[in-house]
A protein has these predicted regions:
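Hydrophobic alpha-helical transmembrane segments in multi-pass membrane proteins
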Residues: 29, 84-253, 269, 315-366, ...
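Binuclear metal-dependent hydrolase catalytic cores
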Residues: 370, 398, 407-411, 421-519, ...
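Membrane-interface helix/helix-cap signal primarily in integral membrane proteins
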Residues: 1-100, 403-404, 424-425, 431-440, ...
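Conserved beta-strand hairpin/beta-sheet module of binuclear metal-dependent hydrolase folds
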Residues: 268-271, 365-444, 449, 546-572
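C-terminal regulatory/interaction regions
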Residues: 219, 277, 281-368, 378, ...
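Divalent metal-coordination and catalytic microenvironments
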Residues: 77, 105, 146, 196, ...
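Membrane-interface amphipathic/re-entrant loop segments adjacent to transmembrane helices
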Residues: 36-50, 57, 91, 95, ...
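Active-site-proximal loop/helix segments of hydrolase catalytic cores
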Residues: 374, 394-404, 434-441, 455-471, ...
Length: 692
């Protein structure tokens, strides 16, 4: 099936559709199963590119003989072939401010050009011939590692420098940098909005413009120049990083001072090894183990600095205009620096601009409650943030895989019965939804710590993203229904709760989580004794019980003045009936149970709750056919405004206790008003909720 690439579904998530379009990809061809694809022919690409990529594969192979993850780190350092680096190692490099080490940048391109010039000079070639050899070497290398923004920028600047050498002209770096940007944008205008393009050119400008102004009186001199270069590049990218990620790494400066000298030695030695690997693979294989100690040291330094205090300094949300103001001052620094009396003023102005870039503009108006249903595919992840700033995460999402089963409309007949009977193996997906979706969304929404994490039940589509979340954020208390389950993700969650000394509470009816300013989340289900009674009635032992897992899902009622919301986990009809018997008060918002399964959201529940807004957390083209048409129809017949994460992306509801605003990441056209229902979607104004 040919379809549009997915766009970003969560707050702060990059738009994947635009990112692919910048690379020339406008559609995705999706096969329904692994057997639907068959390789009929190999090696039919354009001959020069095919030869270059074959050479790359040949020289990467010996590098991967090193133990994991060191071989892949070395391949990333030399050739940008960082696929397969464990996520925890990649995250350590990111938190230490060393992620640039794992990708090819101007350093590698410059070394290739310089090495080619040296070899051509040793062969006593003329200037024109030497320049041609070096330019060709840069072209081949850029093709080998891929034309990323940093590689393209470095290649164009290298060619301009070589042209100046051939013409016996002096190189002017501002002109070269500007020309590289113009050439790259002429080929791909949308690259202007790419963060990688912006970071690459900002870092290069910092190296060339700011570093000379920041040279410290250190000995030896190479250390002074290294410190200045590191500081200049980091200052230049700081506003961009603050605006895009809301955090910076204070460990980056010392980490780079220690790691970059080793990288400076590793890269040329590694290039010599790769050339040898292409010519004499057996000899190269004998020399590869000599690279293990320095690469081991680089990896462990990254891990050390990632754990060091200050490796992540959280910033309040930074507006892009604030980042632009910081750059306006930074761009003026080199010119103002030449007027010596203004040096102190320049320093203060620069610091003030950077500080302003990290200070948000205070929001006007009364405190608000946020309920954000994140887009995590076929799963649940809901953020509650009270008006006092306390944050609670309900579930963490997580994809699941069902053996070799096909998905969506192509699922074979009877598959769901086999899944229910556990005849089809159920495993966690290799996609870490916690690291890739939940954590970035929480960061963007300003979450710095989680006062509580609530796991409604231990199925993979609710627990799969929580290990990454618990490892990343400080957590005050963890609640779950206390029903054992063999899910590896759940086992890991319990291990992290113990390791990080998080308070553990078995959720039971009547427990309350206080969110500040009168807001709270109260546990309505399960009641005390329910789990034991269920086991006694079914004869189940104390171990895992699939029937009990959904039946004992934690149900929460959220309250803030007149705002109310009911979060129902994966409960089904029997539990809904029990809740109605216990007494349910009307709620403005209903998180539809079990992703819209036909076994939930009964007429009795809708009559008792009388919701005005319903949110279904569901994956696009999911295997189960969720939401079931009968559930959607019941909601429509009840006049409920229904949002779906597969269509709308994340759904964000904000309330000041008297009004509610509904917004979606994939904005619907215009403002959809639900007359008499007190909700306006996609609008900056809301209407009063009144009584439910």
């Amino acid at each position: 099936r040919l379809e549009l690439p997915p766009d970003g579904g969560n707050p702060g998530e990059p738009n994947r559709r635009l990112a692919l379009r910048r690379r020339g990809v406008v559609a995705v061809l999706r096969a329904s199963g692994g057997t639907a694809l068959r390789i009929v022919r190999r090696g039919e690409g354009r001959a020069p590119v095919r030869w270059i990529l074959a050479w790359r594969d040949r020289i990467v192979r010996p590098l991967l003989a090193l133990p994991e993850p060191y071989g892949r780190v070395l391949a990333g350092l030399l050739l940008g072939a960082s696929v397969g680096i464990p996520p925890e190692v990649e995250e350590a490099f990111q938190r230490a401010g060393l992620l640039h080490v794992l990708v090819v940048s101007g350093t590698q391109v410059g070394l290739v050009g310089a090495a080619a010039l040296a070899v051509a000079g040793a062969m006593r070639l003329g200037v024109t011939a030497r320049v041609a050899v070096a330019a060709l070497a840069v072209l081949v290398f850029a093709t080998m590692v891929g034309w990323s923004a940093s590689v393209g920028r470095a290649a164009v600047m290298a060619w301009l420098a070589l042209a100046a050498l051939a013409l016996r002209r002096q190189t002017d770096w501002p002109s070269a940098l500007a020309a590289a940007a113009l050439i790259w944008l002429a080929a791909s205008p949308q690259a202007l909005f790419s963060l990688s393009f912006q970071l690459s050119f900002a870092a290069t400008w910092g190296l060339l413009a700011l570093a000379p102004l920041l040279t410290l009186p250190l000995r030896p001199r190479w250390l002074a120049h290294l410190a200045a270069a590191t500081l200049g590049a980091q200052v230049a990218v700081l506003p961009l990083l603050a605006a895009a990620f809301q955090w910076v790494s204070l460990a980056a400066f010392p980490a780079n001072l220690l790691v970059l000298p080793m990288v400076t030695v590793l890269v040329p030695a590694g290039f010599a090894l790769t050339v040898l690997a292409g010519l004499l693979p057996p000899l190269a294989a004998l020399l590869v183990p000599a690279f293990l100690p320095p690469v081991w040291l680089v990896v462990h330094l990254a891990r050390f600095f990632a754990r060091a205090p200050g490796s992540e300094v959280w910033l309040p949300p930074v507006a892009w205009w604030q980042a632009a103001l910081a750059y306006a001052v930074l761009l003026a620094v080199p010119a103002l620096h030449r007027a010596r009396p203004l040096r102190p003023i320049v320093a203060v102005a620069g610091a003030a601009a950077l500080l302003l870039g990290a200070v948000p503009v205070p929001a006007a108006g009364p405190p608000t409650m946020l309920l954000a249903v994140l887009d995590v595919g076929q799963g649940d992840a809901i953020l509650l943030r009270g008006p006092g700033g306390r944050s609670v995460l309900v579930d963490g999402g997580g994809e699941v895989e069902y053996g070799d089963a096909q998905r969506g409309a192509d699922a074979p007949p009877g598959l769901m019965d086999r899944v229910a009977a556990n005849a089809v193996p159920v495993t966690a997906s290799r996609f870490d939804v916690g690291r890739r979706r939940v954590i970035p969304a929480l960061r963007h929404l300003g979450v710095r710590r989680l006062d509580a994490v609530v796991l409604t039940h231990a199925h993979e589509d609710h627990v799969g993203g929580l290990p990454a979340v618990l490892a990343h954020f400080p957590v005050g208390v963890f609640l779950d229904p206390g029903v054992p389950h063999p899910s590896p993700s759940y086992v890991r969650v319990l291990d992290l709760v113990r390791e990080r000394r998080v308070a553990y509470v078995t959720a039971r009816r009547g427990h309350r989580l206080l969110l500040g300013e009168g807001a709270e989340a109260e546990v309505l289900w399960p009641p005390a004794g329910f789990v034991e009674q269920h086991r006694s009635a079914t004869g189940a032992g104390p171990g895992a019980d699939e029937d009990l897992t959904n039946a004992a899902s934690v149900v929460l009622q959220v309250r803030f003045a007149a705002f109310t919301a009911l979060l129902t986990g994966d409960i089904e009809a029997e539990t809904e009936e029990a809740l109605v018997r216990l007494g349910l008060v009307p709620s403005l918002v209903l998180k539809v149970a079990h992703h819209g399964s036909r076994t939930s959201t009964t007429p009795g529940l809708l009559t008792a709750v009388r919701p005005r807004v319903a949110v279904i957390s569901v994956g696009a083209d999911n295997l189960f056919g969720h939401p079931h048409p009968s559930v959607v129809r019941r909601l429509e017949d009840a006049g409920v405004a229904t949002y779906r994460t597969d269509l709308d992306g994340a759904v964000l509801l904000r309330s000041d206790g008297a009004r509610v605003w509904v917004g979606t990441v994939r904005r619907r056209a215009g403002c959809v008003r639900y007359t008499g229902r007190g909700v306006c979607a996609g609008s900056s104004t809301g209407s009063r909720m009144g009584s439910p």
